[in-house]
From Swiss-Prot:
NCBIfam families membership: PRK15051.1
Keyword annotations: Cell inner membrane, Cell membrane, Lipid A biosynthesis, Lipid biosynthesis, Lipid metabolism, Lipopolysaccharide biosynthesis, Membrane, Transmembrane, Transmembrane helix, Transport
InterPro entries in the record: EamA_dom (IPR000620), Flippase_ArnE (IPR022883), Small_drug/metabolite_transptr (IPR000390)
Protein name as it appears in the record: Probable 4-amino-4-deoxy-L-arabinose-phosphoundecaprenol flippase subunit ArnE
Pathway it works in: Bacterial outer membrane biogenesis; lipopolysaccharide biosynthesis
Record-annotated membrane-spanning stretches: 38-58, 61-81, 91-111
Pfam family, one: EamA
Lineage: Bacteria, Pseudomonadati, Pseudomonadota, Gammaproteobacteria, Enterobacterales
Topology of the protein relative to the lipid bilayer: Multi-pass membrane protein
HAMAP family found in the cross-reference section: Flippase_ArnE
Organism expressing this protein natively: Salmonella paratyphi C (strain RKS4594)
Amino acid sequence: MIGIVLVLASLLSVGGQLCQKQATRPLTTGRRRRHLMLWLGLALICMGAAMVLWLLVLQTLPVGIAYPMLSLNFVWVTLAAWKIWHEQVPPRHWLGVALIISGIIILGSAA
């Protein structure tokens, strides 16, 4: 169960980061202020919820086990940027993502 909470905390944290990115996107219309407030508000909600879940994780797992699992954030952000904004991800970056996933698997199996 705590593994699900950890993944959810990670996803909400990433959601907050992605909302911040979306807030910086240029608009061609005059709705810039509304756009900015919407996305920054969503970012705050996501990051606040992530923090609450993270505190639940820390009550259960040692920080030495829990914290490295947040490396998943790098994986989620890379995938989202690639799919949502069609950002270019060089092969070297994909290799890094694969190494992060491998590290998480190794650390997770030791827990």
